[in-house]
């Protein structure tokens, strides 16, 4: 049992540091955060949108920006991984009274699973590398995510009499009366476009140990490098006129340029603004984080072994060892019971289905501009893998799988429109020019299906050493997606 103790001691040592990850918040008080979870909420500055005069536009984008950050973080924490199966099956030799490598030339699936186990007191070690270059989320290109928002509604009586802000003409304002009594600068709105670059290098170490002939335990230990950059183009559309100076060109809302002027200063200046008033600004940031991801431990039991057909069941436990604040992990315990069918032959079909239940995570909670962040439940998932392996030669097996998941209650990015309240033609806003629809992004909670095709091969380099190559191809647009995900790996059975 020394190998078993070694394997599980190693797993616990690796997992322990991440189990105590503390919660954090993305402040909007001028204090920047270097955590990846804060990149989108702070994309327009660490004070929120407090570059405009008196922060009138402050905080408006975050109801839609935060769910996008949630969707990115959640899906990064649930990337598909190769199966921790050995690829080299063992059979019991009655003459030798021990397990020996099977004469079956089929080396098994890559993303799928087969019912057979590694054999008693056998140890399998594997390593794989995957590269994700994400280019879309729910069918929307990551390099051009639009987001538009109005200024906050605010009563004109909020300001002192010396600040000439009479209630504005209500023409074009929402019919629910939420903007009635607001000054005319509430007609101003902002158009933004987010160019998001997101790349992940994922390294996974696999350990499998056979306890008995039909029962094995395994672990997948990921280490990821996540590189993220965001370029945000923001434009303030001035639909109102300020009556008198010191407002530059009689405009209320503008970015503070880095030049001397007589206007009341906002809290933060924008480096790329060189004229006054400045209505266009570009914000950019990039970060890279490397660390341990969520360790997955598995127990699998083969409860039926026929001449060719095998059936097995098991349980995956995803431990919250990865830091969710840096998109390295989910921040929640996940449990996935599963069942496996496989058929042993030169052409070997197989199938696996499972249902994952998740705990509460900061990724789905409230983490922006709050001193007391909260957690909420991650969406549950139904997962399935179906495919076949073909023994091309004694040393080469080709593998094909359909890898799918149904995510329940996920945050989905959808196209939407913001209504322009209309522009004032003078400082008294006696005449309003009607506005039109403005492209933006919205978030809705819905069930989504994510489907990929896996195509690859295993090559037996030596008796117990296998090399694996694979590509994962997206078959639909739902979720955070890369067109092609390459994988390379090595595995060995002791």
Feature names for model-found ranges:
Residues 107, 119-121, 199-205, 290-295, ...:
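Residues that define the transmembrane beta-barrel architecture of outer-membrane proteins
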Residues 134, 215-219, 306-310, 347-351, ...:
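Repeated loop/turn-to-beta-strand initiation elements of outer-membrane beta-barrel proteins
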Residues 137-142, 230-236, 313-316, 323-331, ...:
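Outer-membrane beta-barrel translocator domains and adjoining extracellular loop/strand segments
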Residues 110-112, 189-193, 281-286, 322-327, ...:
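Extracellular loop and loop/strand-boundary signature of outer-membrane beta-barrel proteins
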Residues 143-159, 164, 241, 245-281, ...:
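Outer membrane beta-barrel transmembrane domains
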Residues 129-135, 221-227, 294, 303, ...:
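Transmembrane beta-strands of outer-membrane beta-barrel pores
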Residues 22-174, 415-417, 444:
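Outer-membrane beta-barrel biogenesis signature
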Residues 107, 111-114, 125-129, 205-211, ...:
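Residues on the lipid-exposed face of transmembrane beta-strands in outer-membrane beta-barrel proteins
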